[in-house]
């Protein structure tokens, strides 16, 4: 642990997913004893629960959360009187721990999360009582594939693939999102990033959506709309039945398949009130039973699996030397998905495997990161960072951008997207005043997903933070400059501007987006 975290005694990692969520925790005195929570409302055993809240009619109070909120009928008599789960769990295990002082929270986020979205998550963590203040240093973020990579790094031992320089691909296939990253094993059990992290929304829940679309074709779009609107819990119960009976056991081998009989009269009798007369007559002939055949289920999978395979291919095209591929996340347990991935890439990657309990790989990896943040040595930037400069206007520059004194505001690049940076690496540049009588210099930091930018107001360029320094030595005229330095830390950027004339330094920090 770093010196700034000397008070930390317990690390708690939270994998807050779009479909399922979980948490794990450990005491720094016993880092090998990782505990993954498996006790949830209405469930005992699963390492995650559904990311669902059910509110009362006024949308003020949470009545149910987790699995009961998703697939059970609402009851006005049922109240959610349980204590906040994470706090109560840690308080019970270590009564002497002061939560706000001694607990470090590691929160996982999807790879595509922007600074704005991370800020929203931080604000939610504050409102949920996980941190004492919005500026607390006891909350850190890590991307889901990076956390999974840390967990899978240990899995390399099983294949004797622990040589320094070994590259491996992490494919985190969750319920909602799929995130990928290629990492390189460095000395001292550290990790470096080789390619930009990529991701898309094509996780396991999209197979569920294909099932709902299939059902809509059978009972009518209008009936499905009414079912979603007024009986969402019943619909989700049907989805769970589909998952249990058809989705989870599906291997892609027709010999293993048994026709799934969806009995609407038993599972969803309310549909009788929603279907039109023509559909009702047809379903009555079928005795309200819809047969779901092999080709039906395969079609539900294939559109989603195809998108995942394209994401994997994109990562492997960017890194020709990849020794292993690890599949993690809840949907990675799909036998059909694993089969398709192995068939597609077995000639390119010699090791295609999953670690123990792949559904918990992200949350356990996040916990390992919290216990030793130095495990991540380098990352690849997904943003270009720069400041607004004011050089002389040149022939060919837009006339409408010329200032009255013959200058032009430009985006001055400090470091470009796609570059690999070590944690705590410094990037510096010398910047000069634009006017002889200038009293201060604006060092506002801008970011863009583009590799290059000309102006700070062009589409895609966003202001990350404001930063101004004083330049009192006006007698030096234009012969004044500052050394502007960005230090890329674990979770934030530290900006330093040093006046070269008087040696005075100015500092500020910005939240870092390596995602």
Where are these regions (language model features)?
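Gly/charged contiguous loops adjacent to phosphate- or pyrophosphate-bearing nucleotide/cofactor binding elements
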Residues: 110-112, 146, 199-342, 390-398, ...
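A short acidic Gly-Thr/Ser loop motif
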Residues: 14-20, 145, 163-179, 183-186, ...
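Phosphate-binding loop and its immediate beta->loop->alpha context
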Residues: 29-127, 207-256, 272, 427-428, ...
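Conserved phosphate-binding/catalytic loops in two-lobed NTP-binding clefts
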Residues: 130-147, 339-365
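Conserved phosphate-binding catalytic cores of ATP/NTP-utilizing and phosphoryl-transfer enzymes
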Residues: 1-9, 136-171, 190, 360-377
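Conserved helicase motor "Helicase C" RecA-like lobe of SF1/SF2 P-loop NTPases
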Residues: 119-124, 332-348
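Acidic low-complexity intrinsically disordered segments
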Residues: 187, 266-307, 314, 374-515
């Amino acid at each position: 642990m770093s010196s700034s975290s000397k008070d930390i005694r317990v690390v708690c990692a939270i994998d807050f997913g779009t479909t399922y969520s979980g948490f794990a925790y450990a005491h720094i005195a016993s880092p090998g004893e990782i505990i993954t929570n498996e006790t949830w409302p209405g469930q005992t055993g699963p390492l995650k629960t559904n990311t669902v809240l059910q509110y009362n009619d006024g949308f003020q109070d949470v009545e149910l959360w987790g699995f009961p909120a998703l697939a059970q009928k609402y009851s006005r008599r049922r109240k959610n009187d349980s204590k906040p789960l994470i706090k109560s769990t840690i308080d019970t295990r270590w009564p002497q721990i002061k939560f706000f002082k001694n607990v470090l929270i590691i929160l996982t986020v999807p790879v595509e999360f922007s600074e704005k979205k991370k800020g929203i998550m931080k604000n939610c963590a504050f409102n949920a009582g996980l941190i004492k203040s919005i500026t607390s240093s006891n909350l850190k973020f890590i991307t889901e594939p990076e956390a999974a990579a840390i967990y899978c790094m240990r899995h390399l031992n099983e294949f004797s693939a622990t040589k320094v320089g070994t590259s491996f691909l992490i494919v985190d296939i969750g319920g909602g999102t799929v995130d990928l990253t290629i990492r390189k094993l460095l000395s001292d059990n550290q990790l470096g990033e080789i390619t930009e992290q990529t991701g898309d929304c094509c996780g396991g829940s999209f197979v569920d959506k294909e099932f709902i679309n299939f059902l809509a074709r059978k009972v009518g779009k209008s009936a499905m709309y009414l079912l979603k609107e007024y009986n969402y819990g019943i619909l989700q119960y049907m989805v769970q039945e589909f998952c249990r009976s058809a989705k989870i056991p599906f291997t892609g081998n027709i010999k293993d398949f048994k026709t799934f009989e969806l009995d609407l009269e038993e599972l969803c009798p309310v549909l009788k009130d929603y279907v039109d007369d023509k559909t009702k007559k047809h379903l009555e002939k079928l005795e309200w039973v819809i047969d779901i055949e092999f080709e039906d289920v395969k079609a539900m999978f294939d559109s989603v699996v195809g998108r995942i395979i394209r994401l994997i291919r994109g990562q492997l095209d960017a890194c020709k030397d990849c020794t292993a591929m690890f599949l993690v996340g809840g949907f990675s347990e799909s036998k059909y998905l694993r089969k398709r991935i192995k068939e597609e890439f077995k000639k390119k990657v010699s090791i295609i495997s999953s670690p123990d309990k792949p559904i918990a790989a992200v949350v356990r990896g996040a916990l390992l990161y919290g216990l030793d943040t130095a495990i991540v040595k380098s990352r690849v930037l997904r943003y270009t960072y720069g400041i607004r400069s004011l050089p002389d206007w040149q022939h060919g520059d837009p006339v409408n951008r010329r200032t009255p004194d013959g200058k032009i505001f430009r985006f001055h690049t400090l470091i470009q997207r796609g570059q690999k940076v070590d944690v705590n690496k410094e990037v510096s540049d010398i910047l000069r005043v634009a006017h002889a009588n200038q009293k201060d210099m604006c060092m506002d930091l801008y970011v863009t997903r583009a590799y290059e930018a000309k102006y700070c107001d062009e589409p895609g360029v966003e202001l990350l933070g404001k930063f101004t320094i004083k330049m009192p030595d006006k007698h030096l005229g234009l012969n004044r400059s500052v050394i502007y330095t960005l230090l890329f830390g674990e979770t934030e950027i530290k900006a330093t501007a040093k006046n070269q004339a008087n040696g005075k330094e100015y500092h500020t920090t910005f939240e870092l987006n390596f995602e």
